[in-house]
Curated annotation (Swiss-Prot):
Organism phylogeny: Eukaryota, Viridiplantae, Streptophyta, Embryophyta, Tracheophyta
Compartmental location: Nucleus
Keyword DNA-binding: yes
Name recorded for this polypeptide: Transcription repressor OFP1
Keywords noted in UniProt: DNA damage, DNA repair, DNA-binding, Nucleus, Repressor, Transcription, Transcription regulation
Species of origin: Arabidopsis thaliana (Mouse-ear cress)
Length: 270
């Protein structure tokens, strides 16, 4: 129980029990009168302790002997405050004495041999028990060998052999340059002039650009059977768009020569 607040005995035990306790005390008094030797010890046991400063007690009223054996009423009146304080003091004193005895027995039970420094494990055993798995793990990681390098397959990429030819295919003594002419070659045999726009352009290295342009144009005209002036103009526009400005003069000269070979009327001057 706390030091500030203490429970009352009247709060813990119902009122009917007080009358039973009173009858029990009366029967004990009769036994005490018959046995004078045991009364002294029992009086010491049931003696009321001195009241503390926190719990003032009223003087204990003398009990009147009554030999009535009537049963307690169903609704007995509550006892006075003096009796409550007396019972409270007895309960508090009993609890204090029992707690004191328990503490003394508990403290007495502890022998000086059982100390904290002897109960705890030594440092070496603790370090060995706790750090042994860690040390084993560290040793394992120290001796860990990495797996062998995996042999990866070579990455297959599309070769640009169709876009650019090597120097072996070109005549000896001629170097390929980045600015080689691009010649439009048709990969489909369509019979309309618009097929020249949809045809695929192939970039190849050329030593004689004029001759290569002429062969390519004649092949396109023969495959697509181009004869109309509008289709030929579209073919010329395709060649000019596919090639850089430095080859435009060569393309125009080749186109004029083919135009004359086909015996076509001259194009309308703009």
């Amino acid at each position: 129980m706390g030091n500030n607040y203490r429970f009352k005995l009247s709060e813990l035990i119902p009122n009917a029990w007080f009358y039973k306790l009173r009858d029990m005390s009366k029967s004990k008094k009769k036994n005490l009168q018959s046995q004078p030797n045991s009364t002294t010890s029992k009086k010491k046991h049931h003696a009321v302790p001195t009241p503390t400063s926190t719990t003032p007690l009223s003087p204990r009223p003398p009990r009147r002997p009554s030999h009535s054996s009537k049963a307690p009423p169903s609704h007995p009146p509550r006892k006075s405050s003096g009796n409550r304080l007396r019972h409270r003091a007895t309960v508090d004193s009993k609890s204090s004495t029992t707690s004191g005895d328990s503490t003394t027995t508990e403290t007495g039970s502890f022998s000086p041999d059982f100390r904290s420094d002897q109960v705890l494990l030594p440092d070496e055993s603790l370090t060995g028990s706790w750090h042994s798995p860690c040390s084993s793990k560290l040793s394992k990681t120290a001796t860990f060998t990495p797996p062998p390098e995996l042999e990866l397959r070579p990455i297959i990429t599309k070769t640009a052999a169709t876009a650019r030819k090597t120097a072996v295919n070109s005549p000896a003594g001629v170097r390929l340059r980045m600015r080689s002419p691009r010649i439009s070659v048709s990969s489909s045999a369509r019979r309309s002039g618009s097929s020249a726009r949809r045809s695929r352009a192939v970039v190849k290295a050329s030593v004689d650009p004029k001759r290569d342009f002429k062969e390519s144009m004649e092949e396109m005209i023969a495959e697509n059977k181009i004869r109309a002036t509008k289709d030929l103009e579209e073919l010329l526009a395709c060649y000019l768009c596919l090639n850089s400005d430095e080859y435009h003069a060569i393309i125009i000269n080749v186109f004029k020569q083919i135009w004359l070979d086909l015996n076509l009327p001259p194009p309308h001057s703009k």
